[in-house]
Amino acid sequence: LVKDDMSLILSSFSLFRSSRSSPASASLAGSGHPRTTPPKIASLQSPMVEETKERIAKLFKKKEVSRSTYDTAWVGMVPSPFSSEEPCFPDCLFWLLQNQCPDGSWAQPHHHSLSPSLLNKDVLSSTLASILALQKWGLGQRHIAKGLHFLELNFASATDNSQITPLGFDIVFPAMLDYAADLSLNLRLDPTTLNDLMNRRDSELKRCTENGSAETEVYLAYIGEGMGKLHDWETVMKYQRKNGSLFNSPSTTAAAFIALGNSDCLKYLNSALKKFGSAVPAVYPLDIYSQLCIVDNLERLGISRFFSTEIQSVLDDTYRCWLQGDEEIFMDASTCGLAFRTLRMNGYKVTSDSFIKVVQDCFSSSSPGHMRDVNTTLELYRASELMLYPHEIELEKQNSRLRSLLEQELSGGSIQSSQLNAEVKQALDYPFYAVLDRMAKKKTIEHYNIDDSRILKTSFCLPSFGNKDLLSLSVQDYNRCQAIHREELREFDRWFVENRLDELEFARHKSAYYYCYFAAAATFFAPELSDARMSWAKNALMTTMVDDLFDVTGSVEEMKNLIQLVELWDVDVSTECRSHKVQILFSALKRTICEVGDRAHQLQGRSIRSHIIVIWLDLLHSMMKEVEWSRDKFVPTMDEYVSNAYVSFALGPIVLPALYLVGPKLSEEMVNHSEYHNLFKLMSMCGRLLNDIRGYEREHDDGKLNAMSLYIMNNGGEITPEVAIMEIKSWNDRQRRELLRLVLEEKSVIPKACKDLFWHMCSVVHLFYNKDDGFWSQELIEVVNQVIHQPILLSHF
């Protein structure tokens, strides 16, 4: 960023203050020209790393989910359709007999690895359900005795508010205790805890009865096994899905079959056991969600580029299911939200109508019924941020609604997981378009939970929820890229000194080069993009210094002189430059343009130096026009202002030359195409509008016009700055959404890798202007150090 506020902020940071040369530049001085190819850093091609990649690739074929003791026990209670005296699924009972823990519980492996004290309610519920199943059929008396002993010892956990409470626990667990009494099981339970538990059940049922909402009806149907004779099961069956299940829940479906003997319920249970063997998961089917979770994790951890073939296959399959209206997507809110977000961000044409209907059903509709938790609400919120079209007003409304719900969860302190709490706060503080890629990925890696699980009526895990191989590869890749970035920063430091830029008196910019490079490394980080990062960073610093000449320190003669020098190009700087300052600026600019142009020539197979010169001249002329307007007190129309201001925001020299260095060939026809210019204008307008909002008071005091002041003038001066800010922000929202739509457009003239750079810069400007006081000093210092200088060191390795 090049405007005053960024420069002033940077100049105050002790980290960025620089003398004649920094320690890095001093050690590198005189060592030759900056390197334009990626430094040689240890690659990720070792046999061990390749084996890790192979194991990750196999995750796409393992469509598995952890077995649920709780659900398996309920399926085990199902009687044979031919005889109520015999179990329909004896294999489930044998599985229970074989999987009791030494302490008498029926905990699963993830219960032990995931802070067991927080999952005791889940373990109690699973253990009691297993006891009921065995007792019903007169099996495993020794197992039952051990299980009862465990329940008696740990019963206090049933009312412990510090532990994670499974969905419906306060109704289902007491109901199972009643069922235990019916089966003549003698439980010696603490009477105080038991009374407390029963009171909670009564209060919860009373609340649900008085509420009477459709959402409550869905909730009670989902926990149907805990309602027993209180349920009108015929009414509950309206939630039955095409696969025969109720909510894709084996336990609810088993309870429904026990009550009604519905043949489709039995078909569903048979299909689940056919797929998983002797035990069932907590949710089935979950294939689409599981696959999308792998894709999402790979993208969030920064290693998706290693699995492009597998990811493409998942996305194609998901898109096909989306178009077919597959229940696995549209009957599960989390899956729908993740599918909508992933497909949209990967360029698939998915309308928001179906997604909006799922959101509405999830929170208010009586049909077909969706169960939700904070994870689901967060997933829906992230998906609802992806507004691309002007007509998506309802999507915007749902985004506001979901945001409000998450804020309530956050302020109410109801999120029991500290990690989830942090995720929600991050999502609310930083919208997806105001997050620098590398910052987000580092945070994801550092907070990645290899023992992650989800909890509805019971907890469950997927291979993609917490995977050591994903974490291992992402850490190695991050640290490798970071080592390359540190080497590039040293080269950048050397370039700064070799071009004598440290001699200029506006020394506040001697520090800005750290930020100029950081913005590139934090957005497009892959090793092969080294040339593009260096072009971005060098041109960013040059625009900052040129902007300072035009806006702060230069005379009109110096400004005109610099423009003339660039136009003439082949000049004798010792005689043609009006000042030492102009001589240094022009010499550095010329050398940088030639360096970037030469490297781009090698990649593109044609000369593009003249185009880079034109890009710079466009910027210089637009800056000169602003100076002349201010000098002559000329008041442009809004159209006149905009046509000049988006260029003068100075993103052209930063982004446009770098497009030639990201890989794809860019023909002259492409760079002259309207799509190319639309991408540039939309990106630049976002920065310009946000800058004008931030700089309104300062520029107003200086007698300078911007979009804010012109908007107020065009409305007769009758609207307040606050109203104008709302209008300009709305304008910016439209520009940003249109930019993202173009970037994601599949049929495009400009290659996707090039379009991504426009979006990366858009994210940079939105991050800087996300807070009312900007990207403040201490946070910037911390982030730069983390992303560039601090490797990830985790105790897992």
From Swiss-Prot:
Mg(2+) 2 binds at residues 547, 551. InterPro entries: Isoprenoid_synthase_dom_sf, Terpene_synth_N, Terpene_synth_N_sf, Terpene_synthase-like, Terpene_synthase_metal-bd, Terpenoid_cyclase/PrenylTrfase. Residues 21-32 have a biased composition (Low complexity). A motif (DDXXD motif) lies at residues 547-551. It catalyses: ent-copalyl diphosphate = ent-atiserene + diphosphate. Keywords: Chloroplast, Lyase, Magnesium, Metal-binding, Plastid, Transit peptide. SUPFAM superfamilies: Terpenoid cyclases/Protein prenyltransferases, Terpenoid synthases. It is an enzyme of class 4 (lyase). Pathway: Secondary metabolite biosynthesis; terpenoid biosynthesis. It comes from the Eukaryota. It holds the Pfam family Terpene_synth. One of its GO terms (biological process) is gibberellin biosynthetic process. Its EC number is 4.2.3.185. GO terms for cellular component: chloroplast. It is found in: Plastid, Chloroplast. Its cofactor is Mg(2+). Residues 21-47 are annotated as: Disordered. Binds 3 Mg(2+) ions per subunit. Mg(2+) 1 binds at residues 547, 551. Residues 1-48 form a transit peptide. One of its GO terms (molecular function) is terpene synthase activity. The Asp-Asp-Xaa-Xaa-Asp/Glu (DDXXD/E) motif is important for the catalytic activity, presumably through binding to Mg(2+). Involved in the biosynthesis of ent-kaurene diterpenoids natural products such as oridonin, miltiradiene, eriocalyxin B and nezukol, known to exhibit antitumor, anti-inflammatory and antibacterial activities. Catalyzes the conversion of ent-copalyl diphosphate (ent-CPP) to ent-atiserene. Belongs to the terpene synthase family. This is Ent-atiserene synthase KSL1, chloroplastic. It comes from Isodon japonicus (Scutellaria japonica). The lineage of its organism: Eukaryota, Viridiplantae, Streptophyta, Embryophyta, Tracheophyta.
